[in-house]
Curated annotation (Swiss-Prot):
Localization annotation: Cytoplasm
Pfam family, one: Urocanase
Record lineage: Bacteria, Bacillati, Bacillota, Bacilli, Bacillales
Cofactor, how bound (note): Binds 1 NAD(+) per subunit.
Name recorded for this polypeptide: Urocanate hydratase
Family label: Belongs to the urocanase family.
InterPro entries xrefs: Urocanase, Urocanase-like, Urocanase_C, Urocanase_central_sf, Urocanase_CS, Urocanase_N, Urocanase_Rossmann-like, Urocanase_sf
Organism: Bacillus cereus (strain 03BB102)
Top-level taxonomic group: Bacteria
Gene responsible for this protein: hutU
Keyword Translocase part of the UniProt annotation: no
Amino acid sequence: MEKVQQTIRAPRGTELQTKGWVQEAALRMLMNNLDPEVAEKPEELVVYGGIGRAARNWESYQAIVDSLKTLESDETLLVQSGKPVAIFKSHEDAPRVLLANSNLVPKWANWDHFRELEKKGLMMYGQMTAGSWIYIGTQGILQGTYETFGEAARQHFGGSLKGTLTLTAGLGGMGGAQPLAVTMNGGVVIAIDVDKRSIDRRIEKRYCDMYTESLEEALAVANEYKEKKEPISIGLLGNAAEILPELVKRNITPDLVTDQTSAHDPLNGYIPVGYTLEEAAKLREEDPERYVQLSKESMTKHVEAMLAMQEKGAITFDYGNNIRQVAFDEGLKNAFDFPGFVPAFIRPLFCEGKGPFRWVALSGDPEDIYKTDEVILREFADNEHLCNWIRMARQQVEFQGLPSRICWLGYGERAKFGRIINEMVANGELSAPIVIGRDHLDCGSVASPNRETEAMKDGSDAVADWPILNALINSVNGASWVSVHHGGGVGMGYSLHAGMVIVADGTEAAAKRIERVLTSDPGMGVVRHVDAGYDLAVKTAKEKGVNIPMMK
């Protein structure tokens, strides 16, 4: 991949570079994904998650930018794995962009085949929000991480993580949310990363409190704060596959154990034991097969240590990076003895159509986001947990790139919020249109048997019709851009998922599109879980009037 040293930053304000606000939103969000404040390796078009890219190569990026600048408001741009391939006449209520990233026929859906295609310049890895142009930095996963640790606290520690120690690893774009999510819940956390730059970045953005290269220092500080029942996050430089076994050997057992290293990609995401970053990069280039094997062996040691900690009483869970599957394939037959985070903590939220709803101020003015915060605090005042989140986010979350906010809203709530935001743009309360989107990790938009759809009640974990239906209904209902991806989060062969973005530009046409899209999108989550037999989803569907023909 050619590296290009240029600083990309989304335009701010109300002056258009394009022929309409929906096209402008797509252009600004693509560029925002590659803002150095937001992206992990912008010079390689990598946004987050190992090699999750915003465009296939620099030539494709420029062609997408040029296409968006000339795209009419009754045309649709098609993007195939990060490359613009067609512009068709459509209509004003159609999506302005349709994206399909990293999709492979099942028999060929593996990293080896993907890499062959990538080498030939025929494909890119879009992760989830990298290739769909709605990544907002680490805040994008923060509330989900906060909710996960909060639910763990409710289930196991009396509602708070005060006086507990969490051990985790991986401080990239996704995992970087963990330190702040734990401290927001009152706990102490040691978060390991092999790359000093990742830890430095989290400290700079106030997601992590301190840095150390010493396990002894990390443990001493952790114990001190644990005893005081005060929160602190400690970024520890090192390799988790070395440090976790060492802690097991010393008979040190944290209260909570998880992991968010980029284990979904053994070649580009995980560093084997005994290698510096530089040595790993050299081996990756010279002998990728050996590198992958060493990575998998290290991951197996990593999972073995997590299992040992679980046996000693640690609440242990997989945080969606497919590390258990790798260890299982390497012969560790009890790798799945600890659960994934969705069945353990998040599924009840999915049953209510809740998920990581986000919005971005295209103006670039933080005041626009603060005004929308007030909407949440006013309109959803009865939801104290949600309001607490907004108040904490305001105080503790630093914006990356265009100002944005995330909060988990459910069926009915998303459409209500979208209507209000569109009215605020229309009457000038907000200085420019707002982009509304979400992660692909949502209630009705993903099939991922080792993560979002793990251990479904009816055994339908691998049924992939749902994300396709989600993308189809969002497209016909007028989402501004819609994406269908493969392999996000857990790697090639293990997931299919869809994303949507809708622009609130203050027009009456946008109001109608928002109402349709922000109803059907979370509605798919309710439908998915009703179909799988979840009582809470049935209750939600009946209370909210979701029309499901065969619901009992």
